[in-house]
């Protein structure tokens, strides 16, 4: 329990597990991981069965024999931005006669579960299966929030199963060459268990094989059905009520916008999106397929990984930890040196990684993991980095237009689909650039890019033993006003930077030994800051704490 798998920190093409499944336990986070099992043993791919308070984000699962994903018996879980594809169809499942087709994407279950912004592609069945949970008294208890998912080339089964309360909102189902089923949601009312089995169904789009919309999201009765199991009677309640059962705690896009957002940002795409997942995204966009099953001949539904060309090359990369993370605290040396931390902490000392230097609620380790989970680039001072934005906006195909919506510590321009970023001459450290893509249909999405400049953040360089001139700043720690004075008289340029080198306040004022400059820092969050003062050609940097 309490494990974080941060696959975004892997070198090369990232991590790919084969031949054995991955299980996530309680209070854990799994991000940016690939699981491609291949034919052989009847395994699931990625499991959250029985877990509590856990998250899976930006993972890729394919080539599984049983189910690609399962969360039976779980509580309080989230599966998001994950790509599930090419579950092996006629692959010799140990529990079925030879020749039986399977190809299941997954069973989603749990007393409270959120499943959103995922892509399911080229899976024959269980796209998804909603497997309900029953408590010790025999009462249905599951509450599932299923929204903004994209499902492509689902074969003989779309989403079906039994569930207590299901929000099924703004999903995008796109038929493919192997799709044979008409509805996208089938509730199966059981003849056992106490309580209701219901679904709130709204805003879902169904696209036909020829690209026409069978449901543009406005008909909330089209594409849904329910069935009665043997021994069950007609429900006395509304199976499909008109109001959601509970609020969602993530942004819900329209189904059309979700389609574009998901196909722009899904799966294990850091350090990079591998060749397999690039193909899956491309085929979903095109409504195409490349491979057929060697046993069934079904289009897009492969039966063995060899049908799709087998495993691509993942280079073996060896890192010398003595050079990369000398003190083994999870923060690489370059990060600690950039932000004035100690890359040579004693063994077992995690004070640097667990500290929250900028007091924003996230530890230094979390700040590093966020950087690694964001598309990022490195540029030298005085140079410009050029970034092709199309690889971050694959879903926006219709005349995309790009604009820069936020930047600090540099300038950014867009030339067609190329973003050009130039840091300020005086800046060193890390900053982020937000850009927005808008297409001809008015759909828009904002993403951010990280930029690393130099080897040390401005303001966090060690203060030399010999100061250029005396600076007095008080009170320290400070709550509202910081008073700054110097040993000489004259105009001074004052710049305040946070722990990561980002400028948060600049001021020019006249200071002297007897007249202090009054700086209002009340608006700053709690944390460590650096004050850089320049006067008469001299420069000095001091540290202060904002309470």
Question: Predicted segments — roles?
Answer:
Residues 2-11, 26-37, 50-63, 75-97, ...:
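Right-handed parallel beta-helix
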Residues 129, 134, 139-308:
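Extracellular beta-rich repeat passengers
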Residues 308-378, 456:
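Extracellular calcium-associated, cysteine-rich motifs in secreted modular proteins
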Residues 380-422, 447-449:
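Surface-exposed or secretory-pathway low-complexity segments enriched in glycine-proline
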Residues 424, 436-440, 532-536:
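Beta-strand-rich extracellular modules
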Residues 427-441, 447-449:
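A short beta-strand micro-motif common to beta-rich folds, especially ectodomain repeats
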Residues 441-456, 542-545:
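C-terminal edge beta-strand
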Residues 462-474, 478-547:
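C-terminal outer-membrane/trafficking sorting elements
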